[in-house]
Amino acid sequence: MRIILASSSPRRRQLMELLGIEFEVEKPDVEEEFLESPEETVRELSLRKAEWVFKKRKEEEILVIGSDTVVVLDGNILGKPESLEEAKGMLKKLSGKWHVVYTGVAFVSSETKDVIVSSTKVRFRELPESVIDYYVEKYRPLDKAGAYGIQDFAAVFVEKIEGDFFTVVGFPLGMVWQYLYEKGWWKVASKREDDKGGARVAFG
């Protein structure tokens, strides 16, 4: 069985690489929309992404992983900004406040259709308008829910965090690994006598 990451996000690809398993990447063609709740939104969109790729390759023996992230501020869902001005507006709203980041991860194969959802609370410092302008103009966060990436300069915006850091990045790595491990899909491969490279990881 091969594993495919249904994503266009370079951050999710980088995090998947930390698992030490071989995988492919394919961008799903799924229109993003907000549903009644943030949990339902990330659950449904991550599943749609994984199913889109799975159906395209349904003749193959694969496991597809899809993921989606939203930011919630005062009960309102913030997705990806459509313009730099909208990005600045989002960051002004987040300044000095708590918000919640929700990330869903879906796993789809011929025998599996599971979704996990993780949430993390984040509090931003008070952000001067000049800093917001600098960040948006330099980093152009149009591909990020809430208009920021906690793994880049926006890390300095964070005053407090309660929960999983990688949920905010957009891919709760520990939960993904635990799921794969418990399913028997992530395992340490048997070391061959002629293998001088140390322990190896196998998938499937």
Swiss-Prot record:
It is found in: Cytoplasm. It comes from the Bacteria. Its EC number is 3.6.1.9. It is an enzyme of class 3 (hydrolase). Its cofactor is a divalent metal cation. Coiled coil: none annotated. It holds the Pfam family Maf. SUPFAM superfamilies: ITPase-like. It catalyses: dTTP + H2O = dTMP + diphosphate + H(+); UTP + H2O = UMP + diphosphate + H(+). One of its GO terms (molecular function) is dTTP diphosphatase activity. The active site is at 68 (proton acceptor). Keywords: Cytoplasm, Hydrolase, Nucleotide metabolism. The record marks 11, 69, 151 as: Important for substrate specificity. GO terms for cellular component: cytoplasm. One of its GO terms (biological process) is nucleotide metabolic process. Nucleoside triphosphate pyrophosphatase that hydrolyzes dTTP and UTP. May have a dual role in cell division arrest and in preventing the incorporation of modified nucleotides into cellular nucleic acids. Belongs to the Maf family. YhdE subfamily. This is dTTP/UTP pyrophosphatase. It comes from Thermotoga maritima (strain ATCC 43589 / DSM 3109 / JCM 10099 / NBRC 100826 / MSB8). The lineage of its organism: Bacteria, Thermotogati, Thermotogota, Thermotogae, Thermotogales.
